[in-house]
Amino acid sequence: MNTNMVASELGVSAKTVQRWVKQLNLPAERNELGHYSFTAEDVKVLKSVQKQISEGTAIQDIHLPKSAKKRTGFLVQKTSSDTERRIEQLEQKLDTLLQQRQDESELMARMSELERQLKQKADEGVSYQLLQHRREIDDILADLQSLTSQMKEFTAHSIPETAAASEKTKTRKKPLLSLFKFQT
């Protein structure tokens, strides 16, 4: 019987039963979960204690029946295989969690390495692009300088030609009109 069942049989609270067991060092056994487990003999002893208390005996002066055995500790029940199975399951879960934590650590390290490599590649790409742009700018500047020098040469040579061309046009004034002139 558990504490609640004994308490209801005696008509007291479960806390009262627990207090009597502790203060009087009664022979109640405990199961693997730490709960009291009472036998029929334990219930008789508790009824005797209840009777003495109701008669006004102080808790220190209560006499226990001689049949009361000494407390033997925890009661080992047949659930040891269940307990072993549960322990095994918990150990498996612990192993799984430890493995997951290790895997997580490895993944985090791998992600950090990949981020570092990606950053390095990005830096290299930007550097390459900057160099390529610099080369293109240098090529464009060279072409611009070449075009500028060619333009200067062209403008220097074209000025005398334009002056000579303008002089020629002055001398040839109205050559077609002379052909169509009517003689009068």
Swiss-Prot record:
What compartments host this protein? Answer: Cytoplasm
Q: Which residues cross the membrane?
A: none
Instruction: Spell out the NCBIfam families in the cross-references.
Output: PRK13182.1-4 (NF009648)
Specify whether Oxidoreductase is a keyword of the entry.
Answer: no
Instruction: Mention one GO biological process in which this protein takes part, according to its record.
Output: sporulation resulting in formation of a cellular spore
Q: What is this protein called?
A: Chromosome-anchoring protein RacA
Q: Give start-end ranges for the coiled-coil region(s).
A: 75-156
One GO cellular component term noted in the UniProt record for this chain: cytoplasm
Its keywords, alphabetically, are:
Cell cycle, Cell division, Chromosome partition, Coiled coil, Cytoplasm, DNA-binding, Sporulation
Disulfide topology: none
Superkingdom of the organism of origin? Bacteria
Question: Species name for this entry?
Answer: Bacillus subtilis (strain 168)
